[in-house]
């Protein structure tokens, strides 16, 4: 079904297709095209020097007769720019971005009849009003008390600050740390292997690695190498290679001392008991943060379930490709699945990636709608703080001094997107609480 929009200068006809694809026919009045034609002539002739005329002062008629192709080309560009702007200002399905234009064609540029440009592009999705009355969240659970086991583990982690770390020549055993490097290469090809990571430290314990990964590196010594052939075509494609080589750079024995009052004072505590109190407060705050994140995740799921709309195909495909890559690489390199195990898991992983891609993209657009509908704002201080966070994630603690304008703009956009999403989801939580406490009719 086509829809039409118009004003004094443009008429826009839209044909909508699945995947937020829109075919648009934009027509201009003869008066506007005449104005654009004069602008095109003016731009061409400003650099033209003809005998008997000063630079840029030749009559329009001479310019048109001598440079017809240049004038036509410039006119078409101006017509396309004007028609593109009309998609948003006159029509109601604006393109996602200039890069979302799939095809553009000027089908008419006649001074007497006007101009016409046809576009095919991906548009922002059309989202109806959010049915807040359908939003329902479970009752927020009480924060669990900190257990003795959690306190003991926290104190043990603190004790590592004072630990002695000694590279040893013996074989590795449970509780040791190992320094690993991982490189990828291609069979039967010479060349320098590509590093995936270098000198990364792992603790040989079940809390920090899978049993399969740990088993590979128990009972080995520094200099040991583990080489694997990758059979999975997807993993080969992602890594641009089919041979994984793990190199054990060092086996490190870590001995942590007992904590006492003296060591507690070195950590800005008055005593060991004071350190334990501060640790408990820290663990309680972490527990509150985890609980809030659980509520946040529940709000995301609830919001995504109460409304549905069409998603832009290319954005969905890009997000699906990214998540598929991440899940398969995580299974192969982090969970350390064999090629056979990965093949058995692949179907489930692909389904997970598809569901996650749809949900996260849907939430991205919903968050922007909520942010605008609720008239939420981002303060300068909030933006600066989040830019610092994004900068540390990208560059570490010492960002480059000569950061480019493009990189700075990317940081601003990343920070703004993150804050927009967070504020929108906080609003979802607030609305859910309001709904839960409102008296029933």
Swiss-Prot record:
Sequence ranges assigned to domain PPIase FKBP-type in this UniProt record: 175-257
Reactions listed under catalytic activity: [protein]-peptidylproline (omega=180) = [protein]-peptidylproline (omega=0)
Primary localization class, coarse: cytoplasm
One GO BP annotation of this record: protein folding
GO cellular component: cytoplasm
Keyword Chaperone: yes
Entry keywords, A to Z: Cell cycle, Cell division, Chaperone, Cytoplasm, Isomerase, Rotamase
Record bears the keyword Cytoplasm: yes
GO MF, one example: peptidyl-prolyl cis-trans isomerase activity
EC assignment: 5.2.1.8
Top-tier EC class: isomerase
Places the protein is found: Cytoplasm
Domain-related comment: Consists of 3 domains; the N-terminus binds the ribosome, the middle domain has PPIase activity, while the C-terminus has intrinsic chaperone activity on its own.
Job description of the protein: Involved in protein export. Acts as a chaperone by maintaining the newly synthesized protein in an open conformation. Functions as a peptidyl-prolyl cis-trans isomerase.
Protein name listed in UniProt: Trigger factor
Native species: Chlamydia abortus (strain DSM 27085 / S26/3)
């Amino acid at each position: 079904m086509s829809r039409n929009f118009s004003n004094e200068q443009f008429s826009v006809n839209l044909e909508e297709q699945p995947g937020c694809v829109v075919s648009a026919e934009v027509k201009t009045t003869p008066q506007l095209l005449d104005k654009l034609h004069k602008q095109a002539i003016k731009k061409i002739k400003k650099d033209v020097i003809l005998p008997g005329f000063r630079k840029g002062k030749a009559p329009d008629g001479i310019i048109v007769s001598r440079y017809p192709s240049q004038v036509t080309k410039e006119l078409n560009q101006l017509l396309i720019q004007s028609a593109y702007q009309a998609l948003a200002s006159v029509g109601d399905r604006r393109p996602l971005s200039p890069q979302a234009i799939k095809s553009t064609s000027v089908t008419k540029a006649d001074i007497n009849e006007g101009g016409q440009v046809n576009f095919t592009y991906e548009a922002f999705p059309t989202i109806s009003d959010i049915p807040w009355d359908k939003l329902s969240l479970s009752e927020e659970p009480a924060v669990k008390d900190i257990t003795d086991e959690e306190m003991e583990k926290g104190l043990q982690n603190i004790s590592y600050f004072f630990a002695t770390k000694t590279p040893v020549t013996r074989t590795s055993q449970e509780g040791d740390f190992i320094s690993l490097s991982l490189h990828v290469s291609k069979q039967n090809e010479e060349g320098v292997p590509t590093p995936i990571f270098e000198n990364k430290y792992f603790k040989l314990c079940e809390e920090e690695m899978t049993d399969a990964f740990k088993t590979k590196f128990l009972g080995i010594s520094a200099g040991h190498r583990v080489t694997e052939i990758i059979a999975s075509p997807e993993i080969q494609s992602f890594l641009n290679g089919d041979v994984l080589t793990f190199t054990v750079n060092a086996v490190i024995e870590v001995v942590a001392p007992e904590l006492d009052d003296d060591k507690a004072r070195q950590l800005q505590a008055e005593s060991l008991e004071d350190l334990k109190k501060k640790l408990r407060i820290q663990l309680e705050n972490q527990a509150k943060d985890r609980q809030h994140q659980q509520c946040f995740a529940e709000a995301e799921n609830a919001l995504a379930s109460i409304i549905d709309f069409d998603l832009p195909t290319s954005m969905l495909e890009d997000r699906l490709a990214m998540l598929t890559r991440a899940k398969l690489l995580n299974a192969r390199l982090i969970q350390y699945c064999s090629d056979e195990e990965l093949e058995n898991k692949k179907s489930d992983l692909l389904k997970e990636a598809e569901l996650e891609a749809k949900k996260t993209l849907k939430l991205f657009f919903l968050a922007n709608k909520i942010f605008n509908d609720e008239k939420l704002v981002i303060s300068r201080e909030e933006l600066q703080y989040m830019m610092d966070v994004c900068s540390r994630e990208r560059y570490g603690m010492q960002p480059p001094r000569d950061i480019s304008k493009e990189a700075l703009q990317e940081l601003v956009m990343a920070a703004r997107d993150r804050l927009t999403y967070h504020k929108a989801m906080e609003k979802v939580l607030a609305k859910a609480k309001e709904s839960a406490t409102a008296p029933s009719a």
